[in-house]
Amino acid sequence: MKRLVLPLALVALAIPGIANAELPKDVQAAIAKMGHVNDPKTAPLFAPFHTAGIPSEIKVTRDLAFGSDPAQKLDVFTSGQGTGKPILIYVHGGGFTRGDKHRPGEFMYDNVAVWAVQHGMVGALTNYRLAPAAKYPSANDDVSAGVKYIRDHAREFGGDPNKIFVWGHSAGASLVAIMVSHPNFVKATGGTLAGAIITSGQYEFKAPHPYAGDDAAKVAEVNAVEGLKKTDIPLYFTRAEWDMPSQMQQGDMIDKTLTAAGKEHGFHLMAGHNHMSQVYSIDTGETQLAEPMLAFIQKYSANVKAASAK
């Protein structure tokens, strides 16, 4: 077995309402009551822990275009200080057919990028073209193009182009899994990745599929499992205790499959969480995901040769 062991004793943030780096009992109870569904009532549970908004010292640049399509845009969050920092790029979910990197007036998914900056990184949130109008490989082409844009401009943001980590959730996790399991999508970023964090995705697809299409043979080509066994990119997977049944099955399957293949990887079961709360918990003080994710980034940043200053 080659599962990564990461330290869980990092710094816990002091945010009102969440103490001891745990979900409040009432939030845990509400999540458990929802059950194994993707319930929109999850976001209001976490909104009170994100009322501070974006700290004034963080510089945010919205809607940087990496292509001509309106969906091909990303947001970048920086401290405006320092150089050579790791970069965390977040890929949102939405069933391949909906979703956005930023919802005006709401905390998601600025909370991810704010957390990244507050922990010594550059944070980025990227969009991509959506199905059914855009089928495979459109979204993966966009994720790769967004990463390439960040790589090409990394030094302008204070980042290191050799220390890029991509985190995907739900459909975004599937896109990241497809990306790292298909070398052509990694090559399109202009380099490699320092690591991939993959939260509650699907790694085996069946036709018909909203993104991969209706042709069974083509859908099979999109599947990520075999490529995940072979990639040299460090991998860290999570799923939630109260995840949807398909994500539970897929998360456990990929952990068991990679373990049986002797493929080193990280895997964490998010106790007390559901499909969305894993991401909503970031930058709240509840550190069940934030701590091991930061440890993963720190571990593999240290293993990467820093890019030259030029």
Residue ranges and their predicted role:
Residues 145-213, 219:
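Primarily recognizes the serine-hydrolase "nucleophile elbow" in alpha/beta-hydrolase
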Residues 84-95:
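Short beta-strand element of the alpha/beta-hydrolase
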Residues 26-83:
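N-terminal cap/lid segment of alpha/beta-hydrolase-fold proteins
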Residues 95-98, 103, 123, 149:
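Serine-hydrolase catalytic-loop signature spanning alpha/beta hydrolases and amidase-signature enzymes
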Residues 189-195, 200-260:
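The feature captures the conserved acid-bearing segment of alpha/beta-hydrolase catalytic domains
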Residues 102-124:
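Short amphipathic alpha-helix adjacent to the substrate-entry channel of hydrolases
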Residues 91-93, 150, 239:
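The conserved beta1-alpha1 loop
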Residues 238, 245-248, 252-255, 259-310:
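C-terminal catalytic histidine-bearing segment of alpha/beta-hydrolase fold enzymes
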